[in-house]
């Protein structure tokens, strides 16, 4: 069985993944807080987690993967100084928190489907596991890690000897950049203590509350992932995945409370793809004007062109997004589809069987290549090597199909280009391309976008290439 390596945040080095049970892998993913649409920066992380899971499957592993849905309790600060994200969404749209949660959960998985991100077999809303949260908190009380103060229940981080081991930083390092106007929660024994259960909070209008041994209230954010993972994936987790901004405090706190409860190491490998940035910095919903899959579609981009864009870069590198770089990726993706369509046509014409030995050799190389720290860009390079090789069309096609079980670019759905529009229609569209180029030069982005939409309505997409803008039949 192939060995797959990833950068392990816990050890700060690339390591081969050795599951607790040979041939079987457990993986937990921090799911979305469903108060708004996921932006494409969020989705980059889920794309890379999806690739990792599918690579293990191609390599012969049985993968059991779980994900939470945060539909309660996600405050932007454990000091109760931030915003309750679900309450924020409910106020913004004049709906209940559960209406918001249902809508944006469906929207999240709709975006995932467009990007060929496989839905985990285990998906658990936080609100469905309140008894499990309470049970875990009770266990922390029994073991001396929890205390009640001011009505709330807190985790005592001073009881954890290696609390900062995931971050590799000290308490002082992690306090750098904290705003001066953030008031400490006076109920805490230690600055890094965090809430396990709220009964008193500044959010008096919080509509989601439950009975508990400590009073009527709701769970803190961190408890949910520990309780859900322990329930569905057991006490020995192989890989925990999430965005890099979850390392501290969320994942640090998950480790503290999980290991305090079970009394041994909980998770061996921590997988944190880096941020997608735009020119102004990290993408964030709090900035407003978020860039979603739907926005990309409105501008004429295929969602899988964005997936291809992400696969071109290593997951441990911050990726800078611009429409220019996405245009280049979209152009390369369309050319790739065209080449695969030609191979499909040639294979159908020849009617021969693939050379399974050659296919297996290339699949082994693909697993070894991508499995060296999830190097998807080298995986794409190997794909192009197959396209240019002397293999028969049938062998190429069978190899591409196996590669695409991981890349998930719908390569096997590639079809020959449709017939072109009449000359007079193309002439009008070419004129629009000239006008769009002038608008872009003048930085008149509104006009450029309007022209792109007009071209799309005519059944074409604009693909920007080094030689200039080209028309592509949708």
Q: Can you describe what each PLM-predicted range is?
A:
Residues 1-35, 50, 109-110, 130-344:
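Alpha-helical recognition segments enriched in aromatics with Gly/Pro capping
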Residues 11, 20-116, 464-471:
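N-terminal, positively charged nucleic-acid-binding surface of large information/translation enzymes
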Residues 62-64, 144-150, 390, 461-463:
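Short, well-structured beta-strand/strand-turn elements
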Residues 66-73, 101-108, 118-133, 151-160:
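Short, glycine/charge-rich beta-strand/loop segments that flank catalytic centers
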Residues 88-96, 121-127, 215:
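The substrate-binding groove and active-site-proximal loops of carbohydrate-active enzymes
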Residues 282-284, 289-474:
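Structural preference for alpha-helix termini/caps and helix-kink/transition segments
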